[in-house]
UniProtKB/Swiss-Prot annotation:
Compartment list: Cytoplasm, Cytoskeleton, Spindle; Chromosome, Centromere, Kinetochore; Cytoplasm, Cytoskeleton, Microtubule organizing center, Centrosome
Region (Binds microtubules and contacts the microtubule-binding domain of SKA1): 196-417
Entry's Gene Ontology BP terms: attachment of mitotic spindle microtubules to kinetochore; cell division; chromosome segregation; establishment of meiotic spindle orientation; metaphase chromosome alignment; mitotic cell cycle; mitotic metaphase chromosome alignment; mitotic sister chromatid segregation
Region (Binds the NDC80 complex): 102-417
Originating species: Rattus norvegicus
Protein's name according to its UniProt entry: SKA complex subunit 3
Region annotation Required for localization to kinetochores: where it falls in the sequence: 350-417
Subunit structure: Component of the SKA complex, composed of SKA1, SKA2 and SKA3. The SKA complex is a homodimer organized around a central W-shaped coiled-coil structure, formed by the interacting domains of SKA1, SKA2, and SKA3, each end of the 'W' is extended further by the C-terminal microtubule-binding domains of SKA1 and SKA3; the complex forms extended structures on microtubules. Interacts with the NDC80-NUF2 heterodimer of the NDC80 complex (via coiled coils); the interaction localizes the SKA complex to the kinetochore and is required to establish kinetochore-microtubule end-on attachments.
Gene: Ska3
PANTHER family xrefs: SPINDLE AND KINETOCHORE-ASSOCIATED PROTEIN 3 (PTHR48118:SF1)
Length: 418
């Protein structure tokens, strides 16, 4: 092979390699090569994020649907329970209405009403309600021909609840007022009081049976009182009554003698002290005199008073009972009702006048001698035209309240009250 030709081939292949490398380097410089390599990874990441977002949305929708389904199931269960309760209540109401003569409408009437509600009001006409004059008759419950006339509606009776024995006979009720409708007329004609088929039970008359219980008064033994313990339960009231009866009898002291202070006894009473009975009797309104005003006496101090020194004279008011004897008012063994304060201090002598010590002497001391003139007086003398120069201090006259040697100290003792 020609060496020149082989050299040109090698040079041509080198030039192509250089061109490819140059282009790759240019793309690397421009960033096109990196974008091309990362584009697939970026696209994969975007797809993954979108899938994750869609998955989260689907999960949220599923949770919401699950909650709604749970709520719907709870609602359905509650509706079923309510339907059962309503059906039971409807059955009870139907039985209650049927018990008092209520009859439900026939199926034909309900089907007719259903057709009328579904169809237009102008074209919907029921077969049974073609004539307007028969509407009132059709509104009433249909009665079979073979059956007897049923009992009309009536108010509940005690017999309906099994309380026949508490039924009280009643007079015939006042007839209702006539109305236009035939239904009200028929109902008023067949009232329970006028209907001969209705039997009004009379009040049962039965004798009071005393077999079950006995109405017996309580025995005295239950309260601790009996014929054997009667004398032991007597109180002071009975003793006082017995004491009054003994006083009123001639056995009591006569001629101003005092009642015995020993214990008074009777056959059926306890021994009661005599002074206690006398004191209780003196407290009675019939034997009480008006009390004297008390006198107050303080030992060691005499208070001059404008009133007379004579004692107050007691005034004896007349007793309410003229037949009362002086023995009823004697009270030797009892303490008097009024205590005189003078009697408590009779043993005490009049106290001596208190001695006045040196610190209690209220004589006025001699006034001090002024040797220097104060500054405020000097200022006053400076502006006084009558005095050219200050003069010697003269003896000042005594002020009010200063006493001489021969003057009594009575007025000086009260100088604090000036």
């Amino acid at each position: 092979m020609n060496p020149i030709q082989s050299f040109h081939c090698k040079l041509r292949s080198l030039a192509t390699v250089l061109d490819g490398e140059t282009a790759r380097l240019l793309r690397a410089l421009d960033g096109e090569d990196s974008d091309f390599e990362d584009s697939s990874a970026r696209i994969l990441c975007d797809l993954y994020s979108e899938v994750q977002t869609l998955k989260d949305d689907v999960n949220a929708h599923l949770d919401k649907a699950r909650l709604e389904s749970r709520e719907s199931t709870h609602f359905i269960k509650a509706a079923k329970v309510l339907m059962k309760k309503n059906s039971a209540d409807i059955i009870k109401l139907r039985e209650f209405f049927q018990k008092y003569g209520y009859q439900a409408r026939d199926k034909e009437d309900s089907a007719c009403e259903h057709r009328v509600s579904n169809s237009s009001p102008g074209l919907a006409v029921c077969k049974d309600t073609q004539e307007p004059g028969v509407k009132q008759e059709l509104s009433e419950p249909r009665v079979p021909r073979g059956s007897a006339p049923e009992e009309p509606l009536r108010s509940p009776q005690l017999s309906d609840f099994g309380l026949q024995r508490y039924m009280v006979s009643q007079g015939p009720a006042n007839p209702r007022q006539e109305t236009v409708s035939l239904k009200e007329d028929r109902a008023s004609e067949t009232t329970p009081a006028k209907d001969p088929s209705v039997q009004v039970l009379k009040t049962p008359r039965c004798a009071l049976k005393m077999d079950d219980f006995e109405c017996v008064t309580p025995k005295l033994e239950h309260f601790g009182i009996s014929e054997y313990t009667m004398c032991l339960n007597e109180d002071y009231t009975m003793g006082l009554k017995n004491m009054k009866s003994i006083k009123s009898s001639p056995l009591s002291g006569v001629g101003g003698e005092a009642v015995e202070t020993g214990p008074v006894t009777s056959d059926n009473s306890f021994a009661i002290p005599g002074p206690m009975i006398q004191q209780l009797e003196k407290n009675d309104v019939e034997y009480i005199n008006s009390p004297l005003p008390p006198k107050f006496c303080t030992p060691g101090l005499k208070i001059p008073s404008s009133m007379d020194s004579t004692d107050l004279v007691s005034i004896d008011y007349p007793l309410s009972k003229p037949n009362s004897s002086p023995t009823d008012l004697e009270d030797k063994d009892c303490a008097p009702l009024i205590l005189n304060s003078d009697e408590c201090y009779q043993s005490f002598a009049d106290p001596h006048s208190p001695t006045i010590t040196s610190y209690e002497n209220f004589t006025t001391p001699s006034p001090p001698k002024v040797t220097a003139i104060p500054e405020d007086i000097l200022q006053m003398l400076k502006y006084n035209s009558n005095l050219a120069s200050p003069i010697d201090v003269k003896a000042m006259p005594l002020r009010r309240g200063f006493t001489s040697k021969g003057q009594s100290t009575r007025g000086a003792a009260n100088k604090e009250n000036w």
